[in-house]
Swiss-Prot record:
Residues 385-444 form the SH3 domain. It comes from Homo sapiens (Human). This is Protein kinase C and casein kinase substrate in neurons protein 1. Residues 26-275 form a coiled coil. Keywords: Cell membrane, Cell projection, Coiled coil, Cytoplasm, Cytoplasmic vesicle, Endocytosis, Lipid-binding, Membrane, Phosphoprotein, SH3 domain, Synapse, Synaptosome. Highly expressed in brain and, at much lower levels, in heart and pancreas. InterPro entries: AH/BAR_dom_sf, F_BAR, FCH_dom, PACSIN1/PACSIN2_SH3, PACSIN1_F-BAR, SH3-like_dom_sf, SH3_domain.
Length: 444
């Protein structure tokens, strides 16, 4: 028996990572604490997504508000203006849906996890969770008898291995003494007695080692059964968590997936209908009747001189006022066409930004920058030393001598309020004074 002994067996036995090793149940216990932390992680995850949904919804709202104003003030008109505006309506409605997503995530999903976590994990006064302590105590109790046997086994194995080592050393010394002349017979006998004693120690320690190993083998089935029972209890607890969180994730998916939301689908169905409702021919007819050859015209006629009427008219007096329904000679059809276009709802921002026709008059009284006698003896802009700074939204080329010209982004000074015809007085940074369409600028 001793002759087969190998010194390599004296090296400490490598411990395995098996669940059955003493103390390796702690990973299963730790999983309970991890489950509580994972609930917190999921709630934080949902809360961050809710913030994103809220921010995105607000961005859509701000974007829609800004562009709706720009479209209303811009030159686009007619049914295409309404179709373009439908994009802004879509943004407002989608913003509301994303706010609903945010509310569902916080009020339903997050609260659901929070309540389940509170019911599943019970904190102790001394710290930790009741469920963790129960699992720890269960495993420790199940492993205690087997761990005690394993300790005895380790001691018996160590004693046996040490005896084998002593035996081998004694045999080596005894063999070497036979070749040495200096060793006396008495010394030779002592070395032989040492070998015999070591062999007896090896026999005793081996028998004890085998007996303890046999006892461990007898207790192993009961040990495995007890450990398995506690482990299954932990598995059942973990199964509840896994199933619950899967349900929550499906709820989150349902709330996030707007593609399956009937309201979301309806938004884009309405948007498509609004865009397809744009009619180029209708818009062209409307423009023809309001700003083209279809407009009414007070064609020149012979007029008798009337001493009771002023000889000149101002710029505003020369403009036809559609809203007042003025009947003009030879323009009945055009007026009716204009009225019909209005009935169809083709009210456009273009009306508000349309430059007015050039007067057919050489009289200087029609020019606000003309002689002092015609304009009450003073330039109407000279008293406006102060004003409001504005920025041009679009390019505008003055059509008349008294109109300003500027490019989009240019800044100028507004010197008066908008008149009933949609014009404002202003001053360029160069010092030039004149009129400009009020809806072509925005306050800075």
């Amino acid at each position: 028996m001793s002759s087969s002994y190998d010194e390599a067996s004296l090296a400490p036995e490598e411990t395995t990572d098996s669940f059955w090793e003493v103390g390796n149940y702690k990973r299963t216990v730790k999983r309970i604490d991890d489950g509580h932390r994972l609930c917190n992680d999921l709630m934080n995850c949902v809360q961050e997504r809710a913030k994103i949904e809220k921010a995105y919804g607000q961005q859509l709202t701000d974007w829609a508000k800004r562009w709706r104003q720009l479209i209303e003030k811009g030159p686009q008109y007619g049914s295409l203006e309404r179709a373009w505006g439908a994009i802004m309506t879509e943004a407002d409605k989608v913003s509301e849906l994303h706010q609903e997503v945010k509310n569902n995530l916080l009020n339903e999903d997050l609260e659901k996890v929070k309540n389940w976590q509170k019911d599943a994990y019970h904190k102790q006064i001394m710290g930790g969770f009741k469920e963790t302590k129960e699992a720890e105590d269960g495993f420790r109790k199940a492993q205690k008898p087997w761990a005690k046997k394993m300790k005895e086994l380790e001691a018996a194995k160590k004693a046996y291995h040490l005896a084998c080592k002593e035996e081998k050393l004694a045999m080596t010394r005894e063999m070497n003494s036979k070749t040495e002349q200096s060793v006396t017979p008495e010394q030779q006998k002592k070395l032989q007695d040492k070998v015999d004693k070591c062999k007896q120690d090896v026999q005793k320690t081996q028998e004890k080692y085998e007996k303890v190993l046999e006892d461990v083998g007898k207790t192993t089935p009961q040990y495995m059964e007890n450990m398995e029972q506690v482990f299954e209890q932990c598995q059942q607890f973990e199964e509840k968590r896994l199933v619950f969180l899967k349900e929550v994730l499906l709820d989150i998916k349902r709330h996030l997936n707007l593609a399956e939301n009937s309201s979301y689908i309806h938004v884009y169905r309405e948007l498509e209908q609004a865009i397809r409702g744009a009619d180029a021919q209708e818009d062209l007819r409307w423009f023809r009747s309001t700003s083209g050859p279809g407009m009414p015209m007070n064609w020149p006629q012979f007029e008798e001189w009337n001493p009771d009427l002023p000889h000149t008219t101002t710029k505003k007096e020369k403009q036809p006022k559609k809203a007042e329904g003025v009947a003009l000679t030879n323009a009945t059809g055009a007026v009716e066409s204009t009225s019909q276009a209005g009935d169809r709802g083709s009210v456009s921002s273009y009306d508000r930004g349309q430059p007015y026709a050039t007067e057919w008059s050489d009289d200087e009284s029609g020019n606000p920058f003309g002689g002092s006698e015609t304009n009450g003896g003073a330039n109407p802009f000279e008293d406006d030393s102060k004003g409001v700074r504005v920025r041009a939204l679009y390019d505008y080329d003055g059509q008349e001598q008294d109109e300003l010209s500027f490019k989009a982004g240019d800044e100028l000074t507004k010197l008066g309020e908008e008149d009933e015809q949609g014009w404002c007085r202003g001053r360029l940074d160069s010092g030039q004074l004149g009129l400009y369409p009020a809806n072509y600028v925005e306050a800075i």
